[in-house]
């Protein structure tokens, strides 16, 4: 982003691909609606079987900042994915928005981007192809990545509080927290299963639930930065001494 000079930014993961009209349709949507962000939908491409599955939860239209941020936090019709969107570059430069060095960095950052967008347009077309491979973040899930997922959820709370709008989106944030908790339960079980050790799996799940409750609670100190947010989940190797 530091070397970008154009009016708009768009991101594509190196192992994914896009439809031939991907940029054209996003550009037309953002310019014709005088929007700050334009979003499209995507296909899951399961590489090994060469099967395409279109993401099912969709919407279409032009949304105000509040409407779009609320949808983003619910993480269904609009998701915290950096790569199926085009952005007005000034949102980043004028608000000093960068991506932290962590897994799930888009989740930690998307809320800041949307909080500074006056208008968001969504087109109900799947123009991006998200390759599901054995080397992706979720396919290679481990304790460090699960901890970053939880940390990213806390960073969303910190960002909303810092912007003075948390109370406006508290219900949506709680929905995001519940979804994160359920996803992390699944990732914890998957991690233990891949390591062929279920010892400590309940300990890790309890830690996840406790951390998510804390980050969504009234006593959470939102002045923390992400480097100060502690790890929650341990590797199965580190938990072998625990009793399930």
Model-derived regions: residue spans:
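Short, charged, amphipathic alpha-helical segments
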Residues: 169-176, 202-203
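Amphipathic alpha-helical repeat scaffolds of TPR domains
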Residues: 174-187
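Membrane-interface aromatic/basic loop that binds lipid-linked glycans or pyrophosphate carriers
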Residues: 35, 191-244
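Donor-binding/catalytic cores of nucleotide-activated saccharide
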Residues: 14-121, 131-141
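Short, conserved alpha-helix that lines the donor NDP-sugar binding/gating region
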Residues: 1-2
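Catalytic core of nucleotide-sugar-dependent glycosyltransferases
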Residues: 127-133, 140-165, 187-191, 195-216
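Short aromatic/hydrophobic "clamp" motif used to bind/position activated sugar donors
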Residues: 9
